[in-house]
């Protein structure tokens, strides 16, 4: 078996993200626990190969212990919406970037939560037992030299480090939130713009969002799962993909990036505006002159994207 070179490039990491589900040679689907071999063929083409095909690699960059992702990826054509006021829209198109807010700045105090406080003892007991077993079965561990007190101290230390990482991750996880829907949402108009008469919505797709973010390998795009925290925990490594059932109406897709040692309320990520935005909708509660204002702003920044007044303005008959 070839040694790993660990010579990652942005391009090969993008390739892995886009082809990670099955062997690119035989089509064998990877399952949890399988080994995925990422590297170069003799013609220097990228490949992700299973064990049986791994001999075809001329260079092995890395071997992954394959696992299903913590989140469900939306389909490339799934329609996404982001509602905002005009000032935020102008900021986005003038700077050519997208704002990602730190998880600890969200109003929802359950962002990144593992569970409810009443269930914390169950969580702690599970991982305390997990760490004790891991210490006892660690390669090279001499059990005869391991005292009960040492086992207890080390496992409690690991548990404390795990618990401390929760708040650290809330500060180092940055999120851009999107609403997945084939249609406009009146609730979203009212909830996610400060002044509904001064609001717009940009429409895109999951695939266009991915392309607009330059396929950045560090950014993950996935659907939020809505759970009852009284019945279950979220996830050790994927807590930011879970929200309470009471938020299910949001039907949220989010883009997430981890940035450590960044003590900011949010960060700006470069984005290709022309690839990002398919259409711009103006609030149904906005006056007609405001539509003209939005059109003039779009024209000023030389953005060739349709500006439409909300479809919710259509008149009924009885």
Task: Describe each region flagged by the PLM.
Residues 17-44:
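Short recognition patches in nucleic-acid-associated and regulatory proteins
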């Amino acid at each position: 078996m070839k040694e790993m070179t660990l010579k990652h490039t942005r391009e090969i990491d993008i390739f892995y993200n886009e082809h990670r589900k099955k062997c690119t040679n035989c089509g064998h689907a990877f399952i949890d626990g399988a080994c995925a071999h990422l590297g170069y063929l003799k013609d220097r083409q990228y490949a992700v190969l299973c064990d049986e095909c791994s001999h075809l690699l001329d260079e092995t960059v890395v071997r992954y212990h394959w696992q299903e992702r913590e989140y469900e990826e939306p389909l490339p054509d799934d329609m996404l919406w982001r509602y905002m006021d005009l000032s935020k829209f102008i900021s986005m198109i003038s700077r050519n970037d997208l704002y990602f807010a730190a998880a600890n700045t969200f109003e929802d105090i359950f962002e990144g939560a593992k569970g409810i406080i009443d269930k914390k003892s169950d969580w702690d007991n599970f991982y305390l037992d997990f760490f004790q077993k891991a210490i006892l079965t660690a390669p090279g561990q001499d059990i005869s030299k391991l005292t009960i007190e040492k086992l207890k101290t080390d496992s409690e230390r690991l548990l404390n480090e795990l618990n401390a990482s929760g708040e650290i991750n809330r500060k180092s996880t940055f999120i851009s939130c999107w609403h997945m829907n084939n249609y406009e949402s009146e609730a979203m108009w009212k909830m996610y713009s400060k002044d509904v008469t001064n609001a717009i919505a940009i429409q895109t797709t999951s695939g266009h969002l991915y392309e607009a973010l330059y396929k950045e390998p560090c950014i993950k795009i996935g659907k939020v799962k809505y759970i009852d925290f009284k019945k279950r925990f979220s996830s050790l490594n994927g807590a930011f993909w879970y929200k309470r059932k009471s938020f299910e109406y949001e039907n949220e897709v989010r883009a997430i990036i981890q940035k450590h040692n960044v003590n900011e309320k949010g960060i700006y990520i470069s984005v290709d505006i022309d690839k990002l935005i398919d259409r711009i909708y103006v609030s149904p509660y906005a006056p007609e002159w405001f539509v003209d204002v939005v059109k003039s702003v779009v024209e000023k920044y030389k953005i060739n994207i349709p500006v439409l007044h909300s479809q919710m303005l259509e008149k009924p008959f009885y």
